[in-house]
Amino acid sequence: LVNWGDMTSDSTDTLTFRVESSTAAGSTTSAIAQTFTYRLAAAITGDNWGDATSASSVAVTAAANDSMALVIDVDPAAVTAADTDAKYLNLAIDSVIEAGYVSAWALIEDRYPQSEHLTST
C-alpha cells in the first residue's frame, strides 16, 4: 500500500511505480520488472477504489492525484517464474515533483504457502 499527500507540483509532474525482483538489495541493473495488479483510491475525502488493473508500471499525475493511495498486489508465483533466484522485491518510485510525502508498507506472503512451516530443529 502506497500513500501520498498533497504534492507541490505542476500539471506535468508524476509519480511512477514499478515492482522489480532482484538477487541484490536495492534496485540493480539485473532487476526484473514484475507485472502486478493495482487499484488507485479516490482522493482521501472519497470512498471509492478504481478497477483492478494489470501492469508492469503505473504513473499518476501529482497535480490531479493528491492525497490518494495505491494498492499493489504481486503474485508470488509470478516472481518465482520470472526470477527463481530473487531474494528481494523492490518498489521503485520515480518522481518528478517539487515536494511531497510518500509512504509505503508491504504485507508479504510466503513463496511456498503451507499450513505449518517446517523447522530445522
Regions found by a protein language model. Name each.
Residues 1-121:
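Surface-exposed, low-hydrophobicity beta-strand/loop segments enriched in small/polar/acidic residues
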